[in-house]
Regions:
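Acidic, divalent-metal-binding catalytic cores of TOPRIM
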Residues: 1-286
Length: 286
């Protein structure tokens, strides 16, 4: 009877539908919104649907998620989306105004969920989960901090160009190519960051020559970004998330994990009393 009452109580709770951009976003927003569930409400995270040729089909993307709460008259609906550059635009574009001024739209503040998955303080734990080796051979927080400071000047240019509707001078994809890193190893990280810094300076030099009017706005853009909570040390949270994840963080994490696996295997080879024990330990570790 107690269990039945509990089930009925759960059904009586207010259901709030949270529309997200893709299936990949469901778990992230479940983790966030779950903290705000109580005896009076719960959230159900789902992709929006829309009518097409007489039947409902799944909608994808930020626009679809936001339009779902705009077009539906029922209550208890929210949209949960990536901020992309829209938060940083601060109303300079229609998409930014929609994000900032539409009621019941929750966003990441960071560019995307991928940026938050790259949170520097958690990357060592990722390596431990993969390798079962807790040896701190690499300072992820320092790396992400130095990388962020290195790309910050070009990032400010990117925001300035997008705010001025002049992004054709350097699209986000163009910036991605400049701030990409070479194949990393634990022994060439400093050189990699120096090369990124060199590429950043070269691109800024070209932009200053071709767009002196935008160059004059950069100090104001920098100040406005700091007011929004963006700092040179945390630039990575506001870069193109997929590029950051796939072309910067994953290669470095893979490099560190490979080192930790080799280290653990060499340790097993050294400490095993005999070959049978060594094979058993290696088998368990694998």
């Amino acid at each position: 009877m107690t269990a039945a009452n509990a089930l009925r109580s759960q059904k009586a709770r207010r259901r709030i539908v949270a529309y997200v951009e893709s299936y990949d976003d469901v778990l992230f927003w479940r983790t966030v919104l779950g903290q705000f569930e109580d005896s009076s409400r719960y959230f159900e995270i789902m992709l929006p649907t829309k009518e097409r040729t007489g039947k409902k089909v799944i909608g994808r993307g930020k626009r679809s998620a936001i339009e779902s709460i705009l077009s539906n008259t029922g209550r208890d609906m929210i949209a949960c989306v990536d901020a992309d550059y829209d938060y940083l635009m601060q109303g300079a574009t229609e998409a930014s105004r929609t994000l900032l001024h539409t009621p019941y739209v929750f966003h990441t503040f960071a560019y995307s969920i991928e940026n938050l998955q790259c949170y520097a303080a958690g990357l060592h734990n990722v390596c431990v989960m993969v390798t079962l080796n807790d040896h701190r051979v690499f300072d992820f927080e320092m790396f992400m901090r130095v990388y962020s400071v290195t790309v910050w000047p070009l990032f400010c240019w990117s925001v300035a160009l997008y705010r001025a509707d002049r992004f054709d001078a350097m699209t986000i994809t163009d910036m991605d190519k400049v701030i990409s890193i070479a194949k990393p190893s634990l022994y060439n990280i400093d050189n990699i960051l120096e090369r990124v810094g060199h590429k950043v300076k070269n691109r800024i030099s070209l932009l200053r020559k071709s767009h002196p009017d935008i160059a004059a706005t950069i100090p104001r853009v920098e100040s406005s970004l700091v007011e929004l909570g963006v700092t040179p040390e945390t630039t990575y949270l506001y870069l193109h998330g997929h590029h950051l994840f796939e072309k910067v963080v994953v290669p470095v994490v893979d490099c560190v994990c490979s080192y930790l696996v080799r280290e653990r295997e060499e340790e097993i080879h050294r400490q095993a009393v005999h070959r049978v024990q060594m094979n058993n330990e290696l088998s368990c570790y694998a």
